[in-house]
Amino acid sequence: MTVLLFGFEPFLEYKENPSQLIVEALNGSTILKEEVKGVILPVEYEKIEDLIVTKIREMKPILTLGIGVAPGRAKITPEKIAINYKYSREGDNAGKKYKGEKIDPLGQDGIFTNIPVEDLVDLLNENGIPAELSLSAGSYLCNNAMYIIIREARKYNSLGGFIHVPLHESYAARIQRPIPSMSLDTMIRGIRLSMEFILTNKKENLTFS
């Protein structure tokens, strides 16, 4: 079986995206005998849904996990819920903006992840990786991707979720203002531990085709 990881390309003022670097580092690795496949998403509203839907349909992964950067956050933050809402003061990489439209006109207003994020936060902290639970993935592309990931994972009775990470230290050092960061190695270790924990503790009633 497969674990599917999604990261994002650089966007806005951020010329490097740690989610891309994390996914590229873990692509092709093995987690508890499951092969990790990494896919980098464009930061474009009009493109990500088809790409996510297609990859999940093709691979039917046991776990689909999105990774995104949240500049300003100091810890790894597993997300609890995605909302059916698009709002962006800044455009995406194609200049597209939204002002309150739904991601899925027929979908639920919010979708909870089926990953045990509360326990995951405890695990990361116990392993020396700063983490805290997040109850908001925002309203930009990360929330958009998370909503689609969870919706599609449910169709295959599999696991789906999203984790935000800080900026990586080497990039934050080049930004001319104070901003929280974390080493890339620590974040890679955190995402690897997260996948191991999720797969080890997957719900017994889930079946996979």
Curated annotation (Swiss-Prot):
Active site, UniProt feature? 79, 142, 164
User: What keywords are annotated for this sequence in UniProt?
Assistant: Cytoplasm, Hydrolase, Protease, Thiol protease
Biological process terms in GO annotation: proteolysis
Do you know which CDD domains this protein is assigned to? Peptidase_C15
Main localisation: cytoplasm
Query: GO: which molecular function terms?
Result: pyroglutamyl-peptidase activity
Locations listed in the record: Cytoplasm
Task: Please state the span of the N-terminal signal peptide per the UniProt entry.
Answer: none
Naming one, the record's GO cellular component terms include: cytosol
**Reaction catalysed by this enzyme:** Release of an N-terminal pyroglutamyl group from a polypeptide, the second amino acid generally not being Pro
| Entry EC no(s) | 3.4.19.3
Pfam families, A to Z: Peptidase_C15 (PF01470)
Q: List the disulfide bonds.
A: none
SUPFAM superfamilies referenced in this protein's UniProt entry, alphabetically: Pyrrolidone carboxyl peptidase (pyroglutamate aminopeptidase)
NCBIfam families to which the protein is assigned, alphabetical: PRK13193.1 (NF009672)
Q: State the HAMAP family in the record.
A: Pyrrolid_peptidase
Function field: Removes 5-oxoproline from various penultimate amino acid residues except L-proline.
Q: Can you tell me which family this protein belongs to?
A: Belongs to the peptidase C15 family.
| Subunit field text | Homotetramer.
Protein name, entry field = Pyrrolidone-carboxylate peptidase 2
What is the source species? Answer: Saccharolobus solfataricus (strain ATCC 35092 / DSM 1617 / JCM 11322 / P2) (Sulfolobus solfataricus)
